[in-house]
């Protein structure tokens, strides 16, 4: 009898809590507007579609109800999507926030590396890792970008004068080789061995991640891990990915021990840090001290894995969507070619691009920025509020999920008139100075902004200069049909089909 009363009391409590929570949500939903949710399943039916359609539906609903829109998922899972500058600022600058639930799907692979960590751990890691992007180190990385872009250009030569082909896959492999070599000092040789296991596993993780976002069990991690067939597959792939990184770390540690380098621990003020020959990101982690202690292998692995994930799909999309726009806008491509000739001279095809020379490519930078406006590599970023937060005069409860839609922010017609039009002039110095700090944020803003943005810009510039100095890129027949899809990174659904003509 007593037990029955306890059960009945608990059930009643849960029902009351559910109704209360639902009423709060209804109030917020009414305030912001959004698609009408069905009982229990929310708006899940709207998203029960093929992959690019999921993205298109999200954008359609945001346009219809935005700039700030409320979505409801299974049961009481919900999120607010914001793109108005004042709400974006409040969310990105919130002192108390974690990455949203979506990111935890990557945790088995990336653990709590820089992207996923929060609080003190994040703060300490960001401090340690920041020197890896010092310009002295970036200068060395530029040599790697040159080498890998040269391989890409050579591999592309077989398409000159041929039928349309997908250039996205070539860019992906080039970016993967570049991040592997700069972060670990090792080569997976993806460009010449695309069937390499590591390359295949990284790709599979992206697909599994995307499928999980829209899985009905997405919000129930324990159940998902127990019963979902894809959970088993994910665990297997993660084991293999870790095995690879573990072996690279062990090998490098051994090399450093043998050369007597490992004992020479670095501190932030160590001048040698910036003058080291061929310093990789992994070397920095292997040599750094935190409170007098070196990082252990697991701590190093999570950071290296994070870089492998964040550091190649993002630049791949940046480069590929710039190619897409330049193929469609030959005048812009011509201006970049003129810039190449003006800076590097007529014999520019095999020029060795240095950090300093890359700073001179102003129009190219504008062209890349405009492509990142239309196709921001990370189109949404998510936060889990850790304290009640007021937006537009209404209080969002702590625990709420908020998505910042970079994709929609960049299409605000008041800031970017005729927003779908590709026009690099939007990034002239004069035009840029007239915009607010939250009008254009491809690398996010605030303390959690992208640590790799200068690295990314250098890699993108090198790849595009090498490509355009060698070939004129023309649109393939099916280029007009391009559709995009997104997991954490935006991608062309069927690649970027182009044709190539050799330059004189
Ligand atoms: C075009 C290229 C890139 C774009 C558009 C981009 C964009 C972003 C964005 C929007 C974030 C914020 C994510 C969030 O708040 O959830 C971010 C974070 C991050 N990015 Fe990038 N990224 C790019 C390239 C790179 C590269 C090349 C690296 C590494 C070499 C990198 C490493 C990271 C890391 C580690 C974080 C987490 C930083 C932190 O929370 O402290 N990114 N990136």
Regions from the PLM with identified roles:
Residues 131, 310, 392, 429-460, ...:
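Cytochrome P450 heme-thiolate "Cys pocket" and heme-binding signature region
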Residues 404-432:
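Conserved cytochrome P450 K-helix/beta-meander segment immediately N-terminal to the heme-binding cysteine loop
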Residues 175, 179, 183, 237-245, ...:
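Central I-helix of cytochrome P450 enzymes
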Residues 2-112, 118-124, 139, 143-155, ...:
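N-terminal membrane-proximal hinge/A-helix region immediately C-terminal to the signal-anchor transmembrane segment
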Residues 134, 237-318, 349-361, 365, ...:
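Conserved cytochrome P450 catalytic core segment spanning the I/J/K helices
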Residues 330-332, 440, 453-490:
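Cytochrome P450 heme-binding "Cys pocket" and the immediately downstream C-terminal segment
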Residues 44-66, 240-247, 351-392, 413:
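Conserved cytochrome P450 K-helix E-x-x-R motif and the immediately C-terminal K′/meander segment
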Residues 1-13, 29, 72-80, 136-147, ...:
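Cytochrome P450
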